[in-house]
C-alpha cells in the first residue's frame, strides 16, 4: 500500500506543469478587443517533464495551430467591431472605431434598444481605460426614467402619512365605546340623542326597579345590568344610578322618591342592631 501511495504522489507531481505557460483560452478574446500583442493568439506550448515522451502529439498540435494562426491574425477593425457587438463585456480602446455604431451595424442587443440613441457616447468621448460595459446603459436608463423612479416613492408616503392617524383615532374611539358600556356609563357624544323620558323608563323612581334588559343609546344590550338593578330596593334602599344628563328634572325625581324610603327605615334598623348587640 505504501508503494502504491508513493507512485500516486509521483504521478501527480509529474503531471503538474512546473513552468508557467500561456494557453489559448477565452481570456484571449479580451486581447483581441484591446488589440494587445497585435491581435495574435499564442500557440499551445506543452511544457512539462512528460513532453519528451509524446513527440508526435506535440508536432500535430503545432501544425494545426500554425495553420490557424495566419487566419486569426488578419482581423480588420470592422470585423472586430462586429465581433465586439456579440460579446458586450468591455468598452473598446481609444484607437478603435465607435463601438455602438458597429453594434448597430451588426447584431443589435435587446438591452441597447431600451436606451435612447442620444445617450450613447460618441467615439471622441470613449474612456482610455477598460471598465464594465453595462455602466453607460444604466446611466442612460437613470437619466431617462429619473422622474419615474425617484419622484413616485417620495409622493406615495406624503399621501399615506396624514391618513394613518385619522384611521387610528376612529378605531380607538370604536374600541372605547364598549369599554364605557361595560361600567354603565354613557359617552358624552350620545347625550343629545337621549332624553329625560327614556332615562325614567330605564330606571323607574317610584317602584325602584329597572327592566330586565337595559338598552343603551348605541344599540348594545347589557343583560347583567337588569339583574343588579332589580335588587336595588331590597339590598340597599336608596342606591340609584346617577344620570349624566344636565337636566334637573330627573335628579329631583330620584331624590324625592329615595328620601321618602330612607327616613323611616334607617333608624328602625339601627335600633334593632343596637338592641341585639347589647348583652
UniProtKB/Swiss-Prot annotation:
Ranges of Polar residues composition bias in the record: 243-263
Pfam families found in the cross-reference section: ODAM
Similarity section: Belongs to the ODAM family.
Region (Interaction with ARHGEF5) location: 127-129
Localization per Swiss-Prot or TrEMBL: Secreted; Cytoplasm; Nucleus
PTMs per UniProt: O-glycosylated.
Phylogenetic lineage: Eukaryota, Metazoa, Chordata, Craniata, Vertebrata
Residue ranges of the region described as Disordered: 243-279
Signal peptide location: 1-15
Protein name from the UniProt record: Odontogenic ameloblast-associated protein
Species annotation: Pan troglodytes (Chimpanzee)
Described function: Tooth-associated epithelia protein that probably plays a role in odontogenesis, the complex process that results in the initiation and generation of the tooth. May be incorporated in the enamel matrix at the end of mineralization process. Involved in the induction of RHOA activity via interaction with ARHGEF and expression of downstream factors such as ROCK. Plays a role in attachment of the junctional epithelium to the tooth surface.
List of glycosylated residues: 115, 244, 249-251, 255-256, 261, 263, 273, 275
Quaternary structure note: Interacts (via C-terminus) with ARHGEF5.
InterPro entries the UniProt entry points to: Odam
Biased composition (Basic and acidic residues): 267-279
Principal location class: secreted
Coiled coil: none
Gene: ODAM
